[in-house]
Amino acid sequence: MGFMAYLLSGFHYFIEETQLLATANFLKNSDETRRFSKGVFESSAGANITRGAAWSIRTLAQALALTPDDDSLRAELLNSLQSNVAHYHRRYVETPNNPLGLIQPYD
């Protein structure tokens, strides 16, 4: 929501709005689901179906792109994005029994 608005207007308010949306995605998951401080968006847990996890990661990346280097939230956002990339790479790319990289279906 705030990403494109910030790009068009330059108002700092929209950076904070994007950061709020990214952190709200963390808070909608339990500690165990998001792997505590790693902030992983699991695609097969609760409301995070594949599409929901992808939207959460997109919002996280947008917040990271807008957050200035001297902002204290930047390190947390960067850690979470790196954890998500590592999680999904390990789960779908490195797994020898999943050569096509198919996404796990949800119930």
Label each region the model flagged.
Residues 1-107:
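Catalytic cores of extracellular degradative/oxidative enzymes
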